[in-house]
Structures are given as C-alpha cells and as structure tokens.
Amino acid sequence: TYALFVDPEGALFGVLKSDSGDPLDSEVAIGDFFWMDLFAREPSKAGQFYQQVAGYEISKGEVKEGVERVVLTSHDKSRAGVVPLPEDANRAGWLPYVRVADVDATLKKVTTAGGYVMVPPTPELLESNLAIFVDPQGGVLGIVRWDEPQADKE
C-alpha cells in the first residue's frame, strides 16, 4: 500500500507499507539508490515536518561553503539530507542519487541517450565524485562514485 503527498514547501513524497516489512540495511551496490536530498527553502522547518510525519531524528550535518545541511536519521543511520533550495528554483523537491562505478562514463551514456548534464562532476561534494543530470523526459537524478562501503552516510 502506498500514498503520495505534498509537504508544506511543495515537495512531492510518498509513503509505502510493504506486506513483507522494511528491507534490512545493507551495503549500497553499484546501480543502487544511494541517498536522497530534499532541497527546501527552510531546511530546519522541512526537517521538523519529516520528524513529525515520519519520526525521523534530526541532526545538523557538516557545513560546506557556508551551507548547513540537516540530516534525517532513523535507527542510528543517516537516511536523507535537507539542504537549501537554490534561489532560482521554483519549488522544493527531493533528489535521489544512484551509486555508479564511473561518473564520466555514466554521463556519456546520459548524453548519448538524449539527456543533459545539469551539474558536472563535482569531486568536492560528498568528498567523492557527484554529478546531476536531466533525462529526456525531464526527470532529475544524481549519480555518485563512492569508493568505500557505506556504513553510514552524512
């Protein structure tokens, strides 16, 4: 059973109840969804909303380039980040990231298939290599090369 909702900042999110329960935490393999970031006008307030609705604990993540990240955690695991929405963005939204072996090779496949690169490879973010692209239908996805097994993500 699942349902879709819109949070107070306009970000679409869904909830799911599986008949088999939640999956166990495991290492993130190449091709697996790796992380989620919510881009919000007021990250602290957005974090509080998800704390009230989904029971997440809130912690402050590392500040990079003057930007403070809110981290949503459960069962002592970091689950998602909440970061400031770019000033030129229209509304809040969630951005999923997928773990890849090679960011540059993946972006070549993206452009060959008709997508375009929104944020070029950026090694400074997440202390790894990260890029964001848009597919031909307008879907936005982040990709990350992560060399170490993920025990916890912040």
Segment roles from a protein language model:
Residues 1-6, 33-41, 85-111, 129-134:
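Vicinal oxygen chelate
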Residues 3-4, 38-78, 105, 112, ...:
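Core segments of cupin and vicinal oxygen chelate
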Residues 6-19, 57-93, 101, 136, ...:
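Conserved short beta-strand elements that form part of the metal-binding/catalytic scaffold
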Residues 16-48, 53-59, 93-96, 145-154:
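N-terminal beta-strand motif that seeds the catalytic metal site of vicinal oxygen chelate
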Residues 85, 122-123:
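Short loop/turn motifs that cap or connect beta-strands within the blades
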Residues 118-122, 130:
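Active-site pocket scaffolds in enzymes
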